[in-house]
UniProtKB/Swiss-Prot annotation:
Name of one Pfam family that matches: SbcC_Walker_B
Organism for this UniProt entry: Pectobacterium atrosepticum (strain SCRI 1043 / ATCC BAA-672) (Erwinia carotovora subsp. atroseptica)
Protein name in the entry: Chromosome partition protein MukB
Region of interest: Flexible hinge: 666-783
Residues the entry annotates as binding ATP: G34, G35, N36, G37, A38, G39, K40, S41
Length: 1479
């Protein structure tokens, strides 16, 4: 009997507290006992690390971290190690009694992340005497040892003979070896498998019901049905492969379309370029000839333009010279007009100033007289006012003195003093030192008489002065008038000059009256002179234009000649227009006919090309439309016959395929209903039992069982008797045999074997004789042999069917081609050749073009002559009315005479105009000039002296009068007499003072009034004098300016000057217009010459280039034609309909095809390179080479086994037919490969039933397990309701959902997912694809719901949840579930490992003290019954009488921390020695 593998020991090297410690593991339970921090969890962590060295999974948390989202930073491993190399190894002995040391090397990695480096390794073949610590450490002293590095360990192991050391770089390889050696219960292929294993170990370590496991019990307990899944995958793969083949066919069809597209685009690309080059070659030849004709005509045109340019340049030079003269004359006329206008304005100003001066002179004389009179009166008033003022002052002084004397006692003295003062003033003023108060009267009389005499003398001189002033004013006025007219004249010659001026004024007035008639006469003559000059210029211009000098007398006869010539040319031009219109109409008709034929020619050529192709395909020649329709009827008959023969072959083929399908049924059942019945009855088909029978025995067994070879073998017939009552869907004869399907034999029949036959005794009175069948079908080998023959026959029929299908499709395509031809081209294909008529019409069009060109040249020359004659006639019409002017030769002399006479009269008129008023004033005053009153100044001086003497005499008389009046003051008689005299004198003085003040007031008022009046008179005089002087100065300036202007300012001068200027402006404008016209014509002519020269140069260049292109293209064209003819592609490339397309259209067609070809040949390096080379426009032969390369490439791709042609175009057509046939066959094959939804449902149901039975057997092993109040534990398995509905629909209602399973777009998995969604629309599928959901639905595990139930106390069976159980009960229940999982894994992996290997079983339990003694005993019993090892940890000893117990105590010794370990193997056994690891 094979023994189960066991873990012998666990070794820790250089762990925290354990330097080199080996724990021997008990075959059942190993207990680690110790206080908190003793090292129990560290020991278990070392075990788990060696078992699952995956840092992504390892996480050794404390029980206090149960509610935390994350554990310690180093996941509990870094802190359990010491610095340096650490080891954790497991010593295992497997079922083969092989010792294997599996473990890991651990080492802390420096850094703040607290990482740990792990390296797994194994050592096989290690002798039993060698302990793990001996090989992992090296003794270096009596009590010292060091840990070996992994490399040193490897070297040490390799030195041992028969010992193998293996280091692993991947955890998968490590676990794979552990599975093969029986260390782990299942193969851990992926991280998911490792995670499940770690979750199981973790769940056992921490105890309780692990939600991570209970939530996914299906993944832990139910094995993956890889066989069924692989069958489904194979079916889908076959379908996928079939569909991929179909897709490949479609791709091939697209490739065929691509090839067709390639040949089509290549033909378009090369043919368009080929025909474009052919067209361009023809166009270049025609262009070269046309350029040569244009070159000759341009040279002729250039000569004509050059001659015309010379003539116009000469005329322009003359016009420029004339324009310079006219501009000079026009500028002079404009200046003269400006001077005349200025002189006219000056003359107007002079006349206005003369009138103003006459008026001012008269007013100034009057004002002078008024001012003189006012001055005299003012002088008298001043004297009178001064005298009155003196008198008042004297009287006031006297009155004041007398008043003062009356007021005080000294009045007499004051009066005396005043009298003395008056006497002194009188002496001084009168220059009389001997004057006294006594002789004052005498002197007063004499001075009064002297005053009277001076006054009389003054009055006499004033009268003389007044008379002298009058005579002197007339003489000065007359003298000023003479000086104004004649300039500076002496006073003695003034009278003679005045007489001469008055004598000459009469003749000058007569001359002034003749100015206007002379001006009118001169204006008329000047106008005629200008007209004569204009006529002479017109005559000169006319002579220049006609190239001949003409006399005025010859103009009338020349006019008659021109009129006759114009009439002749007009009739010729009119006739030429009619003739040209006739030629134009004929040319347009010809062009319209050519256009119609050109538009019809491509259609006709395309129809001819199609007719040629149809003739080649059919091998017939067609002359008219009747033959075409008759041949179509023949095609229909041929197609009908071939179709009938093809359908017969298809029927035979279907029969064979039905036989193949029937023989291909699983288990050899020819009727699918038998499989359902066998499943229903719980039996097995007899054909399945004998499925492995050999080919030689197949005839015997087939004859042996005869009609019952399709029977169903059941274990008990009585059990199915009731089911037969309602049986409907079954064969007519259903055979049932009772027997054990696992050990069935043929002993149920009594049989005698004959020569190739058997006799079967069915009953006592019934025998059956059966011959061996010629083709036995009993057993898989016989069926496969028959299937092979049927398949061969089917292949032959398929080939024959393919040939007939090919012929039918070929006939159909030919019929379709004829149908398209009739609908598209039959109306035009048998018409006359339009190209022949186009060539005839093109020749006629060329003749018409040449005739019209010649005619246009003649017509243009006639039109030029006609225009020239009309222009000359117009000029003559202007000259003929002026012939008399041209013949008048005395006109210039008469103009000069009148102009000289007019100058004289204008001079006299200007003199009269300037001095006429002055002469009129001078005429009555001329006699005054005969005598000059020279004594006027002396009389004026005498008058002034007399006036001064009179004023002095008056003052002297006044002072003497004052002395005489104060004479009494010089002596007083007494005081009373002096007072009385003073009182009388006071009254007298007062009376005189009043009179004097009244006179003074009156004198002041008169003086003020006269002073105001004199001021006004003086202001008016000054204003008039100023105005007179200003206007006199302005008049002098105006006269000087008029003299400086030097023109006559008469009434008609401005009109004449303006008329002259306007005439010259009109002539200048006409000249400039002609000059501008000539300049424009010269510019246009030069531009035309430049254009013609550029055109000529371009034509020469283009002509030479065109000739070079023609020559070069000829060589290249010869190469192209040689390639085309040598390779036989001329018929495909020379597409005559393309000749009617423009070069741009052909280039666009070629470019579009090139773009499509680049995409088409992107994956073909050779064609891509050839295409790239063909893009060179200078090498057209490379496009032909590309076309040839495309044809060669397609010829190489032709399958000669199915296509019988070398022409790629025909091969493409045959390929299309063949691909259609293959598509039909593959679609039929896909229907054969389709997965039956009913069979899928049956397979899933069978698998579910098998797994439910397996779970029930696992439950039997847990029925006796009890923990606390938990009496029993079981695993409940149910099928989900939604999935049950899905299975029912798949098996019974699949017809309702054939739209999913018959769709070519969906795989079976996708169809299954769509059906599931259709049945359960309320379920959210999330982001998963239908393929993923379908694959899940093909896995039976997804149909099951699993949960753990416990039988607890009075509650009965309830769901196992931690909240409903105590801690111990939960730990025990969880441990039971884990044991079930381990058992399930072992059974699942049994077929994957060696038959002589039973894997180790080991679980963990930390903090086992939470279990009571009964539960612990149950655990021990469970481990004993299941041959399972268990490692538990608890603070106290648990059941020390069983298993092995280790007591751990952590101590500090000499500043070093270590764990003291004591081991106990049950009660009564010997205690091992205490071991203390070296520190």
């Amino acid at each position: 009997m094979i023994e189960r593998g066991k873990f012998r020991s666990l070794t820790l090297v250089n762990w925290n507290g354990f330097f080199a410690r080996t724990f021997d593991l008990d075959e059942l339970v190993t207990t680690l006992s110790g206080g908190n921090g003793a090292g129990k969890s560290t020991t278990m962590a070392a075990f788990i690390t060696a078992l699952i060295p995956d840092l992504t999974l390892l996480h050794f948390r404390n029980t206090t971290e149960a509610g935390a989202t994350s554990g310690s930073r180093d996941k509990g491993l870094h802190g359990k190690l010491r610095a340096g190399v650490c080891y954790s190894t497991l010593d295992v002995v497997n079922s083969r009694h092989q010792r294997v040391l599996v473990g890991v090397r651990l080492q802390q990695v420096a850094g703040r992340d607290r990482k740990v480096d792990i390296k797994p390794f194994t050592i096989q073949g290690l002798p039993t005497a060698i302990q793990p610590t001996q090989i992992l450490t090296q003794i270096v002293g009596d009590r010292q040892a060091r840990v070996l590095s992994l490399q040193e360990l490897k070297e040490r192991v390799e030195e041992m003979e028969g010992v193998q050391f293996k280091q692993f770089n991947s955890i998968t390889d490590y676990h794979s070896l552990m599975f093969d050696l029986g260390v782990v219960p299942r193969r851990l292929r992926s991280a998911s498998d490792r995670s499940k294993f770690y979750r199981l170990i973790e769940a056992s370590l921490y105890g309780g019901i692990s939600s991570a496991i209970t939530r996914s019990l299906r993944d832990y307990l139910l094995p993956e049905n890889s066989g069924v899944r692989k069958a489904f995958q194979d079916m889908e793969a076959a379908l996928r492969e079939n569909r991929m083949t179909l897709e490949a066919i479609r791709v091939t069809q697209s490739d065929r379309d691509l090839f067709k597209h390639l040949i089509s685009e290549a033909t378009s690309y090369v043919a368009a370029d080929y025909m474009r080059h052919a067209n361009e070659r023809r166009i270049h030849l025609d262009g070269a000839l046309e350029l040569r004709r244009d070159l000759f005509s341009s040279r002729k045109q250039l000569s004509s333009e050059q001659y015309r340019h010379v003539e116009m340049a000469r005329e322009l030079t003359e016009q420029n010279d004339t324009e310079g003269d006219l501009e000079t004359d026009y500028q002079a006329a404009s200046d003269h007009l400006n001077l005349v206008q200025t002189a006219m304005r000056q003359q107007e100003k002079i006349e206005r100033y003369n009138a103003d001066l006459e008026e001012l002179s008269y007013r100034l004389e009057e004002q002078n007289e008024v001012v003189e009179e006012a001055r005299d009166q003012q002088a008298e008033n001043e004297e009178r006012a001064d005298a009155a003022e003196l008198e008042v002052d004297e009287l006031k002084s006297q009155l004041a003195d007398y008043q003062q004397a009356l007021d005080v006692q000294q009045t007499r003295a004051i009066q005396y003093q005043q009298a003395q003062q008056a006497l002194e003033r009188a002496r001084t003023l009168c220059q009389l030192p001997d004057l006294t108060a006594e002789n004052a009267d005498e002197w007063l009389d004499s001075y009064q008489a002297r005053e009277q005499e001076a006054t009389e003398i003054l009055l006499m001189l004033e009268q003389k002065l007044s008379v002298a002033d009058a005579a002197h004013g007339q003489f000065e006025q007359a003298y000023q008038l003479v000086s104004k007219i004649a300039g500076a004249v002496s006073r003695s010659e003034a009278w003679q000059v005045a007489r001469d001026l008055l004598r000459d004024s009469s003749s000058q007035r007569y001359q002034a009256e003749r100015v206007q008639p002379l001006r009118m006469r001169l204006s008329e003559l000047e106008q005629r002179l200008r007209e004569q000059q204009d006529a002479e210029r017109l005559l000169q211009d006319f002579s220049k234009r006609n190239g001949q000098d003409y006399q005025p007398e010859e103009l009338e006869s020349l006019q008659q000649e021109l009129d006759a010539r114009i009439e002749t040319l007009s009739s010729l031009v009119a006739e030429a227009g009619e003739r040209r219109m006739t030629l134009r109409q004929e040319l347009e008709q010809t062009q319209q006919r050519i256009q119609k034929l050109t538009a019809r020619a491509p259609v006709w050529l395309a129809a001819q090309e199609t007719l040629t192709q149809l003739s080649e395909q059919s091998g017939e020649t067609f002359e008219d439309s009747r033959q075409v329709t008759e041949f179509m009827q023949q095609l229909l008959e041929r197609e009908r016959e071939t179709t009938v023969e093809r359908d017969d072959i298809a029927a035979r083929k279907r029969q064979i395929e039905a036989q193949v399908d029937r023989l291909s049924q699983p288990g050899g059942s020819e009727d699918p209903r038998l499989n359902a019945l066998a499943e229903r009855f719980g039996g097995v088909l007899l054909s399945e039992i004998y499925d492995d029978v050999t080919l030689d025995d197949a005839p015997y067994f087939s004859a042996l069982y005869g009609p019952s070879r399709h029977a169903i073998v059941v274990s008990d017939l009585s059990l199915i008797r009731d089911q037969l009552a309602g049986l409907e869907d079954c064969p007519e004869d259903l055979y049932l045999i009772e027997g054990d399907p696992q050990s069935f034999d043929d002993s149920v029949f009594a049989v005698d074997e004959l020569e190739r036959a058997v006799v079967v005794k069915v009953a006592e009175r019934q025998w059956r004789y059966s011959r061996f069948p010629e083709v036995p079908l009993f057993g898989r080998a016989a069926r496969e042999m028959r299937l092979e023959g049927l398949r061969d026959e089917r292949e032959a029929l398929a080939e024959q069917y393919a040939t007939l299908s090919f012929d039918v499709q070929k006939t159909q395509r030919l019929h379709q081609s004829f149908s398209r031809f009739i609908g598209t081209h039959l109306a035009v294909v048998f018409d006359e050749d339009p190209e022949a008529e186009i060539r005839t019409l093109s020749s006629r069009r060329g003749e018409l073009d040449r005739a019209m060109a010649s005619f246009d040249g003649e017509n243009q020359q006639q039109r030029q002559q006609y225009e020239q004659a009309k222009e000359a006639s117009g000029q003559l019409n202007k000259l003929i009315p002026r012939i008399s002017l041209l013949c008048d030769e005395t006109l210039q002399d008469r103009v000069e005479e009148i102009r000289a006479e007019l100058d004289e009269t204008e001079e006299s008129a200007r003199f009269i105009q300037q001095h006429g008023v002055t002469l009129t004033k001078l005429e009555p005053l001329v006699s005054v000039l005969q005598s000059d009153p020279q004594q006027h100044e002396q009389l004026q001086e005498d008058y002034t002296q007399a006036q001064n003497a009179q004023r002095q005499a008056k003052q002297q008389a006044f002072t003497l009068t004052e002395v005489v009046q104060r004479r009494a003051h010089f002596s007083y008689a007494d005081s009373a007499g002096m007072l009385g005299e003073n009182a009388g004198l006071n009254d007298k003085l007062r009376h005189r003072l009043e009179q004097a003040e009244a006179e003074r007031t009156k004198a002041r008022e008169q003086l003020r009034q006269h002073q105001t009046q004199l001021t006004q008179y003086s202001q008016v005089q000054a204003s008039l004098k100023s105005s007179y002087d200003a206007k006199q100065d302005m008049l002098k300036e105006l006269l000087q300016e008029l003299q400086d202007i030097g023109v006559r300012a008469d009434a008609d001068a401005e009109a004449r000057a303006r008329q002259r200027r306007d005439e010259l402006h009109a002539a200048l404008s006409t000249n400039r217009s002609r000059r501008n016209q000539l300049e424009k014509q010269i510019t246009f002519c030069e531009a035309e010459m430049d254009s013609v020269q550029k055109k000529l140069r371009k034509l020469e260049r283009d002509y030479h280039q065109m000739r070079e292109q023609v020559v070069t293209a000829k060589a290249g064209w010869c190469t192209v034609m040689r390639l085309v003819k040598d390779n036989g592609v001329e018929r495909r490339l020379h597409r005559r309909e393309l000749a009617y397309m423009e070069g741009d259209e052909l280039r666009s067609m070629s470019d579009k095809a090139l773009g499509a070809l680049r995409l088409a040949v992107a994956d073909n390096e050779h064609l891509r390179d050839v295409l790239r080379l063909s893009e060179d426009p200078k090498r057209p032969e490379r496009k032909i080479q590309f076309y040839i390369a495309v044809y060669q490439h397609l010829r190489e791709r032709i399958r000669q086994d199915i296509i019988r042609t070398d022409d790629p175009v025909e091969a493409i057509e045959q390929m299309e037919i063949e691909l259609n046939r293959l598509t039909e066959e593959l679609m039929a094959r896909e229907q054969m490969l389709a997965i039956s939804s009913r069979s899928v449902a049956n397979i899933i149901r069978k698998t579910i039933q098998r797994e439910q039975n397996r779970i029930r057997m696992l439950n039997q092993g847990l029925q006796a397990v009890s923990f606390g109040q938990v009496k029993s534990v079981r695993l409940n398995v149910n099928v989900r309701e939604t999935h049950t509905t899905l299975l029912n629909v798949l098996s019974e209602q699949q017809e309702m959902h054939q739209d999913l399973f018959n769709s070519n777009r969906l795989t079976f998995s996708e169809a299954l997912a769509k059906l599931y969604q259709r049945l359960n629309p309320e379920i959210d599928m999330g982001q998963r694809t239908p393929q993923t959901i379908g694959e899940e639905l093909l896995d039976y595990r997804n149909y099951l719901e699993m949960e753990v139930e416990v039988n607890r106390g009075a509650d009965g069976w309830l769901r196992a949840e931690s909240g409903a159980l105590s801690t111990g009960e939960a730990i025990g229940t969880g441990m039971s579930i884990l044991v079930m999982v381990v058992q399930s894994w072992e059974e699942e992996s049994k077929r994957l490992r060696g038959k002589d290997i039973i894997p180790c079983r080991l679980l963990f339990l930390d903090e086992a003290a939470r279990l009571d003694a009964k539960s612990i005993a149950t655990l021990f019993e469970l481990c004993d019954r299941l041959e399972m090892q268990l490692v538990i940890a608890a603070p106290e000893n648990i059941s020390p009488e069983k298993g092995t117990t280790y007591k751990l105590v952590r101590k500090v010794y000499q500043n070093n921390e270590h764990v003291h370990v004591v081991g106990l193997r049950g009660f009564g056994t010997e205690t091992p020695e205490t071991q203390e690891p070296a520190s």
